Amino acid sequence: MAVKEVHGPGPRGARGPRPKVENPGKLLKRIMDEVFRNYLPHCILVLVCIVVSALANVQASLFLQTLMDDYIVPMTRQQNPSFTPLAGALVRMCCIYLVGILAAWANARIMVNVTQGTLRNLRTKLFTHMESLPIRYFDTHPHGDIMSVYTNDVDTLRQMLSQSIPQLVSSVITIVSVFFSMCMLSWQLTIVTMLMVALMLFCSKQIAKSSSKYFIQQQRDLGKVNGYIEEMMEGQKVVKVFTHEQQTLAGFRELNDQLKESAKQANSFSNIMMPVNAQLGNISYAICALTGAAMAVGGVGSMTLGTVVAFLSLNKGFNMPISQVSMQANSVIMALAGAERIFKMMDEPSEIDEGYVTLVNAKYDRNDQLVETAERTGLWAWKHPHHDGTTTYHKLAGDITFTDVDFGYVPEKTVLHDINLYGRPGQKIAFVGSTGAGKTTITNLINRFYDIQDGKIRYDGINIHKIKKADLRRSLGIVLQDTHLFTGTVMENIRYGRLEATDEECIAAARLANADGFIKRLPEGYNTMLTGDGANLSQGQRQLLAIARAAVADPPVLILDEATSSIDTRTEALVQRGMDGLMYGRTSFVIAHRLSTVRNADCIVVLEQGRIIERGSHDELIAKKGKYYQLYTGNLTEN
């Protein structure tokens, strides 16, 4: 269900042809499937209420004929008329209206429950699926645009489910029942009415055709505006540092103007629909009134005053749902545009995981054999099921090997070439090199954020493609280049590394990372609330918490992606002491800005344009006087 849209060269937001929804019928069916899956009985009850309400309104209009011909007109010919029969008739008419009102009230109440429940389920499915998407998706889609799917696009469905669809169903039932009722009263006046209805439908179709493309573009432009706002909020410090407030505002105005134009065009067309249909309805009403009166006075057929009054009431009740159908059509078009974006995200392929080797708690039995256990022992093993039905267990050691690995973020552009390296348990492997050399890319391959095109990566001798991704990542401690902290207490952020960790284990991890000192100086210590990605902490403090979070997971392999790149010298010394203790006995892959932080690495791997050009210890590489020597003696940094 792709949306056809072509962007040519030009400034931000330059547009090609206007997009249009493909397969609207398929989209609508998919939306209704979401509703019926959990609320089919409710929808049947809503349909019953709509039918009762529509028939009550029709019956009330037909009752006007009886009221006029059998009660009011005869009373005008009596000198002392009795109002008792008329009062009884009015009571019956009020009862009919009351039934219609109660049915409409029940319909509205039930639809609120159906709509909100469906949207809750849809948001849950959307979020669940989002969690299964590969990192590649988030690297290639603006986060604000993704947020717009949850907010604006889902809200268009709320309007459609709670208002448009019930109104459309009610209008169709009303139109059908009123049509047959009008035919029973006067086929001549029915023909007059239908001629005006044909004109109303023609006008509505032309207006809807003109506005639909703008409603779709409006949703797109709204997503762009949300994406831009979120991006600028995240980068507000950078904007202010470089004093780019005016340029940022200019960019926002450009996107905001695009949104204004598409919204103006969409609503300009849709807003004239109701007045046009209302005036055509009034013309139809006037023509029927004049024609009916002439027929009644001329004694044509069985036309009476009551028939004319009843028919005019039905005429009004017929034209109104026609106008409502036209108006709700625009709401449905907007909702379909939002639904297309929702389902497009839900149809994104989930992260592929064909692994079958899992990570389990283990212990040694009496025969000194590794066996699986439900209790946490601190000893982990790879559980490897085989085709013959047997299962073997291998102790988790932390041995990582790359063999002839090639990789590109896009197939036609390889960024890593023939990578061969290994990290033995307890070794510290450091990556250095210029910007874009491939250092971070290698770490992304270890945790399978991306998968290689050629070669093999083995973990404890097991091809990592055979290991379930969740278990693979559970065995890795990762400190990312951009530290992210969640809204919550300091303790909760540390515990994120292992949710079942006790407070004592979290505090021990903080001490290991040398974070305990500054945490205790916070207003509430470990219970201090962090908001806005830990904006009330320094960059160094945030990275210390990230290291503590990795430490509490107690992994055999560490990936430190430029963990100390933004820390001052004093804080770096604290971190380095903590990290030396954390890395002891663990395989560690480290990327750092300062080459001084990797001097004690067991092996330093020098990368250039995706290839390993040097490897060895610090002293060995200095003696070679190659690229590493140039970086080190020239006081250059890798990034």
What are these regions (language model features)?
Residues 17-25, 49, 56-72, 87, ...:
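Juxtamembrane helix-loop junctions of ABC transporter transmembrane domains
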Residues 10-19, 116, 124-148, 152-154, ...:
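Short intracellular "coupling" helices and adjacent cytoplasmic loop segments at the cytosolic face
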Residues 74, 181-195, 265, 269-340, ...:
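Helix-loop-helix
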Residues 38, 42-55, 96, 163-217, ...:
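Transmembrane helices of ABC transporter permease
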Residues 79, 362-639:
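ABC-type nucleotide-binding domain
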Residues 37-40, 135-136, 154-161, 165, ...:
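An intracellular "coupling" helix at the cytosolic face of ABC transporter transmembrane type-1 domains
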Residues 1-57, 72-93, 107-111, 115, ...:
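Membrane-integrated ABC transporters
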Residues 29, 48, 103, 107, ...:
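Hydrophobic alpha-helical transmembrane segments of ABC transporter permease domains
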